[in-house]
Amino acid sequence: LEIGKNDKIKSLDLFKIDIINKNEKDNKLEFKKVNNNYYLTGSQFDGSKNIKNILVNSSKSIFSNFKNLNTYIYLDIDKYFVDKKSYLSNVKGEIQLKNSKIFNSNLSAKLNKNRNFELKIVTNNNQKITKLDIEKPAPFIKNFKFIKGFKDGNLNYESFEYEGKIKSNLKIVDFKVQEVPVLAKLLTLASLQGIADLLTGEGIRFTDFEMDYESLGNTTTINEMYAIGPAISILMSGYIEKNKLVSLRGTLVPATTINRTIS
């Protein structure tokens, strides 16, 4: 291990972890340098904190502790926890780093033994393209505090990052949410109490959800967001400033309104 200025790691040949963390999870990993590449292998690791940082667009990354790391990292981890109970198994793939930042990546795993998980990152002409596919993504969705009781569904995420600006598209199909506090409050104010009760009780099922949005700095602009379901459909747009302001506008259409219009 060689440490340079600003406490950045200049060189690392071997690093082993064999501990029990505060979540009472065993962490057994080996990070080993072979020629100019690294192999990250292990039987189990608690990565719940890393997952949360990724989902909230945190700039923190374990690779930022290295100084100008240019290498390939090959992964083979038996069990990678994404929260206290859920985990990715048989995590395999590779990550290419340039200047300590992810340049390309191709990872696959099984979520809770039998659900598909795939992550691909490709960089071309200074544009980074990220694609994420998750079957039954509830363990990841639960990190967003404004959604509770998410069930079922398939998630497809794609983003394009260029010069600090990120354009993203998120799709989720055939899912149920038990509680969305902000939406439930809006429905109550609109005298749609029956739907509000569903949203805080058994939940409302949606067949399709899609959101196109752009992120720059601390501001996320939602160009269009819609959700379609048998009880209610939603169309919204607006913007969100991190830890500050939320401004959304749109239309809520209950199924009773649609039925009356058709009849």
Residue ranges and their predicted role:
Residues 1-220, 225, 229-263:
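Membrane-proximal interfacial segments on either side of biological membranes
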